[in-house]
């Protein structure tokens, strides 16, 4: 069964997992959908404006026509949150899809763009840590895929990386670019710490520069902690003092095992999580 879900579509709120698209809908057929993911937890929804702005930017990248302003998205999110019990932990997903194909079927027709906003009950993972390994799959580049958008068509690559890692007994995996440089985890951005310095892969056009990632970097630097964006290899993570992840699923989480090496949640991870929670409630 689906958790409690509310969706705003065609001018009204509807409950449940709604069948909104048809068998000829372009985004279902040829993958032209975009979305974003924000969070509401403990009564707050940090950086909601940035998530709403990003879904509109993603739509333009994918040749869709965004028709909802950031302010309208935010207002609808607040309406949707009010439909749940107070302090319910929610996943917030604005989405654009193309209904019809454009010339020669392959591109979408921008004028057929439709949108919806879905909120659903989705508890965040407890900060108990998770295991990672190295994925054999690679991140695409900007000249091979629309990696500058949060597009649904990108996620099967992440999914196969996750499936492969789980088949080997790991929770997640580091995915590299075609040059062998670390890009991200299968579903989140990744950080490491060495000798008191936080280090994270520099955005190089192969992965999404996450909103939570950017926020954590700003918070750590404002707290006087050195954060370096750099080109990293897998061996750097194998030798790290700490590894942690940022993303919308659970915000800031520690990695407690890389391959067969155990790690403990360290002071820099803990500080990053503390700072983020303080910011969210500020």
Residue spans of the language-model regions?
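Helix-start/capping segments and mature chain N-termini
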Residues: 1-79, 97, 103-282
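Ordered, amphipathic secondary-structure segments that act as subunit-interaction surfaces
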Residues: 83-95
């Amino acid at each position: 069964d689906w958790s409690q879900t509310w969706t705003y579509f065609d001018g009204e709120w509807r409950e449940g997992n709604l069948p909104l698209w048809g068998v000829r809908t372009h985004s279902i057929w040829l993958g032209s959908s975009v979305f974003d993911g924000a969070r509401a937890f403990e009564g707050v929804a940090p950086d909601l404006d940035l998530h709403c702005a990003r879904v509109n930017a993603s739509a333009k990248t994918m040749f869709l026509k965004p028709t909802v302003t950031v302010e309208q998205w935010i207002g609808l999110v607040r309406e949707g949150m009010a439909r749940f019990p107070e302090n319910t932990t929610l996943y917030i997903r604005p989405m654009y899809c193309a209904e019809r194909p454009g010339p020669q079927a392959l591109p979408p027709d921008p004028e057929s763009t439709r949108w919806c906003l879905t909120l659903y009950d989705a508890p965040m993972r407890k900060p108990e840590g998770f295991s990672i390994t190295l994925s054999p799959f690679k991140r695409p580049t900007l000249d091979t895929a629309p990696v500058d958008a949060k597009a649904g068509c990108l996620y099967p690559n992440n999914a196969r990386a996750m499936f492969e890692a789980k088949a080997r007994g790991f929770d997640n995996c580091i995915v590299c670019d075609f040059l062998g440089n670390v890009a991200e985890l299968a579903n989140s951005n990744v950080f490491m710490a060495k000798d008191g310095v936080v280090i994270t892969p520099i955005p190089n056009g192969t992965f999404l520069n996450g909103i939570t990632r950017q926020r954590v970097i700003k918070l750590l630097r404002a707290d006087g902690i050195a954060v370096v964006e750099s080109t990293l290899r897998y061996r750097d993570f194998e030798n790290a003092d700490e590894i942690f992840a940022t993303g919308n699923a659970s915000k800031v989480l520690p990695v407690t095992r890389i391959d067969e090496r155990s790690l403990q949640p360290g002071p820099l991870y803990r500080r990053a999580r503390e700072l983020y929670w303080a910011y969210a409630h500020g």
